[in-house]
C-alpha cells in the first residue's frame, strides 16, 4: 500500500466526514443547542420575574400588615377614647346625682331646722307666757296679746 494513497484516502474520508457533519449533524445540533439556550434564558427570565413578583407580593403583604396594624391601633385608640367618654359620662352623672341628693338632704335639713326653730319659738313663747303669769300672778290672755307674742317669737 502506498502511503500517498492512504493519506489521500484518509484526507478524502476526513473531508467527507466533515461535509456530513457540517450538513447533516451540525445544523440540528446547533438548533438543539440554541433551543436549549433559549429555554435556559426563558427559565432565567421567568425566575427573575418570579423573584420580582415575590418581592412585590412581599411588599404588598408588608404594606397590608402595616395598614392592618394602623387600623388596629386606630380601633384600639377609638375604643380607649370611647371608654374614657363612658367613664367621664358616668362620673358626671354620679356627680350630678350626688349633688341632687345632697341638695335634697340639705333641703330636708333646712326644713327640719325651720320646724325645730318654730317649735322652739312656740316653746319659748309658752315659757314666756308661763313666766309672765307667774310674775304677774295672773293669767295673760293669749289671744289679746298675740301680736306681742309674735313679735317676741320673731326676735327670738
Curated annotation (Swiss-Prot):
Membrane topology: Single-pass membrane protein
Transmembrane found in the keyword field: yes
Main location: membrane
Transmembrane segments: 3-23
Keywords: ATP synthesis, Cell inner membrane, Cell membrane, CF(0), Hydrogen ion transport, Ion transport, Membrane, Transmembrane, Transmembrane helix, Transport
Annotated localization: Cell inner membrane
Alphabetical list of InterPro entries matching this protein: ATP_synth_B-like_membr_sf, ATP_synth_b/b'su_bac/chlpt, ATP_synth_F0_bsu_bac, ATP_synthase_B_chain
Top-rank taxon: Bacteria
GO cellular component: plasma membrane; proton-transporting ATP synthase complex
Pfam families: ATP-synt_B
One MF annotation (Gene Ontology) recorded for this entry: proton-transporting ATP synthase activity, rotational mechanism
Family: Belongs to the ATPase B chain family.
Self-association state and partner proteins as the record states: F-type ATPases have 2 components, F(1) - the catalytic core - and F(0) - the membrane proton channel. F(1) has five subunits: alpha(3), beta(3), gamma(1), delta(1), epsilon(1). F(0) has three main subunits: a(1), b(2) and c(10-14). The alpha and beta chains form an alternating ring which encloses part of the gamma chain. F(1) is attached to F(0) by a central stalk formed by the gamma and epsilon chains, while a peripheral stalk is formed by the delta and b chains.
PANTHER family the UniProt entry points to: ATP SYNTHASE SUBUNIT B, ATP SYNTHASE SUBUNIT B', CHLOROPLASTIC
UniProt function note: F(1)F(0) ATP synthase produces ATP from ADP in the presence of a proton or sodium gradient. F-type ATPases consist of two structural domains, F(1) containing the extramembraneous catalytic core and F(0) containing the membrane proton channel, linked together by a central stalk and a peripheral stalk. During catalysis, ATP synthesis in the catalytic domain of F(1) is coupled via a rotary mechanism of the central stalk subunits to proton translocation.
Name of the protein: ATP synthase subunit b
Organism of derivation: Stenotrophomonas maltophilia (strain R551-3)
Gene that this sequence comes from: atpF
Amino acid at each position: 500500500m502506498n502511503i500517498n494513497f492512504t493519506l489521500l484516502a484518509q484526507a478524502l474520508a476526513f473531508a467527507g466526514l466533515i461535509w456530513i457533519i457540517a450538513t447533516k449533524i451540525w445544523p440540528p445540533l446547533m438548533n438543539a443547542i440554541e433551543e436549549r439556550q433559549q429555554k435556559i434564558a426563558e427559565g432565567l427570565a421567568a425566575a427573575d420575574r418570579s423573584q420580582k413578583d415575590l418581592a412585590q407580593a412581599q411588599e404588598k403583604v408588608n404594606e397590608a400588615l402595616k395598614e392592618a396594624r394602623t387600623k388596629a391601633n386606630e380601633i384600639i385608640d377609638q375604643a380607649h377614647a370611647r371608654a374614657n367618654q363612658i367613664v367621664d359620662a358616668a362620673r358626671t352623672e354620679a356627680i350630678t346625682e350626688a349633688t341632687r341628693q345632697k341638695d335634697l338632704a340639705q333641703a330636708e335639713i333646712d326644713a327640719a331646722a325651720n320646724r325645730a326653730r318654730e317649735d322652739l319659738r312656740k316653746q319659748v313663747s309658752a315659757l314666756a307666757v308661763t313666766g309672765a303669769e307667774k310674775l304677774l300672778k295672773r293669767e295673760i290672755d293669749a289671744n289679746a296679746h298675740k301680736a306681742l307674742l309674735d313679735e317676741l317669737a320673731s326676735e327670738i
